[in-house]
UniProtKB/Swiss-Prot annotation:
SMART domains xrefs: AAA (SM00382), Bac_DnaA_C (SM00760)
Entry GO CC: cytoplasm; plasma membrane
Record-given protein name: Chromosomal replication initiator protein DnaA
Function: Plays an essential role in the initiation and regulation of chromosomal replication. ATP-DnaA binds to the origin of replication (oriC) to initiate formation of the DNA replication initiation complex once per cell cycle. Binds the DnaA box (a 9 base pair repeat at the origin) and separates the double-stranded (ds)DNA. Forms a right-handed helical filament on oriC DNA; dsDNA binds to the exterior of the filament while single-stranded (ss)DNA is stabiized in the filament's interior.
Length: 443
C-alpha cells in the first residue's frame, strides 16, 4: 500500500493546480496499516479540505494502484517505526531528548531570501521581511503588511520569512494560508459547529502568514473571526505577516477596526521592478532552470515586459520551452520571434490612452483638461506625470508621445520627464503618486 501513495500523489499533481497540490496534498504523510492507509495532516484545516475536495479521487486512485481504496484522515504526524534496542555497553550514556518534529505549515521551501532578487522597488520589503524573521513578534513590524499588484514578489517574501524563521527555530509552528482558505475553513467550522476547534488552531502557532487579505472585504463574519485571531496572536507576540493587492485603507468593505489593526505594525509597498531589477530577475530565473540566456536577451525581455515578475517568468518559460523543443539557440532574433505575440499584447495593455485616462482619473480631471493647452499647476503637473509615465512604460518615442498629448513638441516631453524625476527626489507626495499610478497601470 505504501508504494501506491507516491504514485497516487504523482497523478493528483497532474490533475489539480500546483498551488492546490502544494497547499493541501503535499503536507500529507501516509502510514501503511496493511489493509488501509492513514493520511496524517498537520492541522484540521487540511483534513477538512482533503475530505471535502480530494478524498473521493484519492480513494479511486489507491483502489487502482493498490487494489484497495480504504483511506482514513487524521491530524498529526505519521508515527515513527520503533527502533531496535541498542546493544548493552559498559559505560552509561546520558539520554538525549528526541528532536521535535517540525510543524508542516504549507510553506514552500523553494522561496528564500537567498533567491529573491533585490531592487529599488522591493528593498524595503525585503529588509522588513528579514527583520520579521529574525525578531518575530517585535511590535516594530508586527503585523508586517506587504502590499502591491499581483506578481511582484509579495508571496515570495512571505514564504522566505517563514522559511527563515523555521530555519532559525526548527520547532517553530508557522502557518501559511490564502485568505480564501481561512474563509473556507471558517465556513466549514460554522457548519460543523466546530468554531472552538477552529480558534484553537491559531493558539498553537508561532507565526501566521495570510495572502491576499483584500478577499475579506464584505465578509463580515470572516473579518470578525480574523479580528479576534489577530488580537490573540498580537497579544501573544506571535508574528503576523499579510499581503494585500493595495494599501488596506483603500480596500472598500474592510471594517475600520480591522484597517486600524493592520496599521499597528509596518506596511510596505512592493512596486513593479525597474529595468535593472527585471533583467537581474530574468537571468536569475534562467540560472535556476539551468538555461543559457545571453545578457542581450535578458535585456530585451526586461525592456518589453514591464508589469510584474510573473510575466517575466512566463516569457522566460515560453522561450526556454521552445528552444528545448526546436533545438535552437536562444538569441535576440529567436526571442523576438518566439515572444512576438506576448510582447505585442503587453504593449497594447499599457498604451498612452490608458496612461492618460488613469492619470486623469487619479487626479480627478477631465481628459480634455489634461490634454489642453492650459498651464495651471493643477493641470501641468498631472500632464507631466502622464508624459513621464508614457516614456517609462511604453516604447513610443518622444515625438510620438508629444503627438498623443495634443501635438506637443518632443522637447516638452523631455522636459516633463526630467522635471518629474527631479521633483520626485524631494517631493514624497509626488513619489507616492508615481508609485500608485505605476501599480494601477500594472494591474
Amino acid at each position: 500500500m505504501m508504494d501506491a501513495w507516491p504514485r497516487c500523489l504523482e497523478r493528483l499533481e497532474a490533475e489539480f493546480p500546483p498551488e492546490d497540490v502544494h497547499t493541501w496534498l503535499k503536507p500529507l504523510q501516509a502510514e501503511d496499516r496493511g489493509d488501509s492507509i492513514v493520511l496524517y495532516a498537520p492541522n484540521a484545516f487540511i483534513v477538512d479540505q482533503v475530505r471535502e475536495r480530494y478524498l473521493p479521487r484519492i480513494r479511486e486512485l489507491l483502489a487502482y494502484f493498490a487494489g484497495n481504496g480504504e483511506v482514513a484522515l487524521a491530524v498529526g504526524s505519521r508515527p515513527r517505526a520503533p527502533e531496535p534496542a541498542p546493544a548493552p555497553v559498559a559505560a552509561t550514556i546520558a539520554p538525549q531528548a528526541a528532536p521535535i518534529a517540525p510543524f508542516a505549515g504549507n510553506l514552500d521551501s523553494h522561496y528564500t531570501f537567498a533567491n529573491f532578487v533585490e531592487g529599488r522597488s522591493n528593498q524595503l520589503g525585503l529588509a522588513a521581511a528579514i527583520q520579521a524573521a529574525q525578531k518575530p513578534g517585535d511590535r516594530a513590524h508586527n503585523p508586517l503588511l506587504l502590499y502591491g499588484s499581483t506578481g511582484l514578489g509579495k508571496t515570495h517574501l512571505m514564504f522566505a520569512a517563514g522559511n527563515a524563521l523555521r530555519q532559525a527555530k526548527p520547532a517553530a509552528k508557522v502557518m501559511y494560508l490564502r485568505s480564501e482558505q481561512f474563509f473556507s475553513a471558517m465556513i466549514r467550522a460554522l457548519q460543523d459547529k466546530a468554531m472552538d476547534q477552529f480558534k484553537r488552531q491559531f493558539q498553537q502557532i508561532d507565526a501566521l502568514l495570510i495572502d491576499d487579505i483584500q478577499f475579506f472585504a464584505g465578509k463580515d463574519r470572516t473579518q470578525e473571526e480574523f479580528f479576534h485571531t489577530f488580537n490573540a496572536l498580537f497579544d501573544g507576540r506571535q508574528q503576523i505577516i499579510l499581503t494585500c493587492d493595495r494599501y488596506p485603507r483603500e480596500v472598500e468593505g474592510l471594517e475600520p477596526r480591522l484597517k486600524s489593526r493592520l496599521a499597528w505594525g509596518l506596511s510596505v509597498a512592493i512596486d513593479p521592478p525597474d529595468f535593472e531589477t527585471r533583467a537581474a530577475i530574468v537571468l536569475a530565473k534562467a540560472r535556476e532552470r539551468g538555461a543559457e540566456i545571453p545578457d542581450d536577451v535578458a535585456f530585451l525581455i526586461a525592456k518589453k515586459m514591464r508589469s510584474n515578475v510573473r510575466d517575466l517568468e512566463g516569457a522566460l518559460n515560453t522561450l526556454v520551452a521552445r528552444a528545448n523543443f526546436t533545438g535552437r539557440s536562444i538569441t535576440v532574433e529567436f526571442a523576438q520571434e518566439t515572444l512576438r505575440d506576448l510582447l505585442r499584447a503587453q504593449q497594447q495593455a499599457i498604451g498612452i490612452p490608458n496612461i492618460q485616462k488613469t492619470v486623469a482619473d487619479y487626479y480627478g480631471l477631465q481628459m480634455k483638461d489634461l490634454l489642453s493647452k492650459r498651464r495651471t499647476r493643477s493641470l501641468a503637473r498631472p500632464r507631466q506625470v502622464a508624459m513621464a509615465l508614457a516614456k517609462e512604460l511604453t516604447e513610443h518615442s518622444l515625438p510620438e508621445i508629444g503627438d498623443a498629448f495634443a501635438g506637443r513638441d518632443h522637447t516638452t516631453v523631455l522636459h516633463a520627464c526630467r522635471q518629474i524625476r527631479t521633483l520626485m527626489e524631494a517631493d514624497g507626495k509626488l513619489r507616492e503618486d508615481w508609485e500608485k499610478l505605476i501599480r494601477k497601470l500594472s494591474e
